[in-house]
Amino acid sequence: MGVFVFDDEYVSTVAPPKLYKALAKDADEIVPKVIKEAQGVEIIEGNGGPGTIKKLSILEDGKTNYVLHKLDAVDEANFGYNYSLVGGPGLHESLEKVAFETIILAGSDGGSIVKISVKYHTKGDAALSDAVRDETKAKGTGLIKAIEGYVLANPGY
């Protein structure tokens, strides 16, 4: 299995505690509201803590797909949230899993800096294509932007 690591960063105007709550705690309720392709999130295994596996169902090209999302670690005190995409037809066939290590830091003017380390675990000795990496990055960035947009549009959140 090959492992390919990339670090990304996203800057938000939302304060770290509020952005963490939306991304790590309330995403299951927010995602279907802000991403029209998302059909729902359900717990397949676990109690919501580390080790929990969730199924995110998505409508793509007119058919329902899903990806399995495993919660690896939660560090509420430091706004850390680690998870992996571990299966389902929505996970590219060349990938064994994709692990995300996320931490939200205080940014300027009360906003946040979301730092993400992404580890792509490919099957066998397969290389990671730029297309797969770009698609995964675009979906991740889109998810963060959509959830951030929800928080900004709902001041009472």
Curated annotation (Swiss-Prot):
Keyword Cytoplasm among record annotations: no
UniProt protein name: ABA-responsive protein ABR17
An example Gene Ontology biological process: abscisic acid-activated signaling pathway
InterPro entries: Bet_v_I/MLP (IPR000916), Bet_v_I_allergen (IPR024949), Plant_def-hormone_signal (IPR050279), START-like_dom_sf (IPR023393)
Matches recorded under SUPFAM superfamilies: Bet v1-like (SSF55961)
Family affiliation: Belongs to the BetVI family.
Pfam family, one: Bet_v_1
Record key words, sorted: Pathogenesis-related protein, Plant defense
Species whose genome carries this gene: Pisum sativum
Record's note on what induces expression: By abscisic acid (ABA).
Record keyword DNA-binding present: no
MF term (GO), any: signaling receptor activity
Gene Ontology CC entries for this record: cytoplasm; nucleus
